[in-house]
């Protein structure tokens, strides 16, 4: 149990997808203007990562890994296309569910919901799972922790950006300029976790 708690804390803080690996920056910067929208997208990313990482773990271990289907056959060259296909299918299902049951959130996310399909944080989580050879249980914890870490980062950035509306930011830095500086400072803050040994 201690191993799984350690993996969860590590994936949220120490190896944060957004602030340590800088994955998912497109939607991270574009949707982080309001906390409510950021929280909604963060929940969507948590759901997709929590499902996509373990599902792709099963696909990799039961189909794509060397000697998984037939002795001497290695289908790992199909990793990228298969993982992207699974992620795309999951995002389409999530999009239909949000459209049906949560229309305001679906409308607020707009074009960024389909962009979760190509969000490199999702694909990065799946790739790290394969690279680190996580088992099924570890992949569930890692997917959930990575999603929560990404959501924590985008909601924190949105909160800061909402407060910066009332600040006297120099004209040349308004908009994305000050946002990049803020993200850099947040990343420096998260770097302090890198010395933690779990």
From Swiss-Prot:
Q: Which UniProt keywords apply?
A: Cell inner membrane, Cell membrane, Ion transport, Membrane, NAD, Sodium, Sodium transport, Translocase, Transmembrane, Transmembrane helix, Transport, Ubiquinone
Its membrane topology is listed as:
Multi-pass membrane protein
| Subcellular localization(s) per the UniProt record | Cell inner membrane
Give its E.C. classification number. Answer: 7.2.1.1
Q: How is its activity regulated?
A: This reaction is tightly coupled to the Na(+) pumping activity and specifically requires Na(+) for activity. Inhibited by korormicin and 2-N-heptyl-4-hydroxyquinoline N-oxide (HQNO).
Q: Which InterPro entries match?
A: NqrDE/RnfAE, NqrDE/RnfAE_oxidrdctase, NqrE
A GO biological process held by the record:
respiratory electron transport chain
The record's function comment reads: NQR complex catalyzes the reduction of ubiquinone-1 to ubiquinol by two successive reactions, coupled with the transport of Na(+) ions from the cytoplasm to the periplasm. NqrA to NqrE are probably involved in the second step, the conversion of ubisemiquinone to ubiquinol.
The record describes its quaternary structure and partners as: Composed of six subunits; NqrA, NqrB, NqrC, NqrD, NqrE and NqrF.
Write the protein's name. Na(+)-translocating NADH-quinone reductase subunit E
């Amino acid at each position: 149990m201690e191993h799984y708690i350690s993996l969860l804390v590590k994936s949220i803080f120490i190896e944060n997808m957004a602030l340590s690996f800088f994955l998912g920056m497109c939607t991270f910067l574009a949707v982080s203007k309001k906390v409510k929208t950021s929280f909604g997208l963060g929940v969507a990313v948590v759901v997709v990562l929590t499902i996509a990482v373990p599902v792709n773990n099963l696909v990799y271990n039961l189909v794509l890994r060397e000697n998984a289907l037939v002795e001497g056959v290695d289908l790992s060259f199909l990793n990228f296309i298969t993982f992207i296909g699974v992620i795309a299918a999951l995002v389409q299902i999530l999009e239909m569910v949000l459209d049906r049951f949560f229309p305001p959130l679906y409308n607020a996310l707009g074009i960024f919901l389909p962009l979760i399909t190509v969000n490199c944080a999702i694909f990065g989580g799946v790739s790290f799972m394969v690279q680190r050879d996580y088992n099924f249980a570890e992949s569930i914890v890692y997917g959930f922790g990575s999603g929560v870490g990404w959501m924590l980062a985008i909601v924190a950035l949105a909160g800061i950006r909402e407060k910066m509306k009332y600040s006297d930011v120099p004209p040349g830095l308004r908009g994305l300029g000050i946002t990049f500086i803020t993200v850099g400072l947040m990343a420096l803050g998260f770097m302090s976790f890198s010395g933690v040994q779990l």
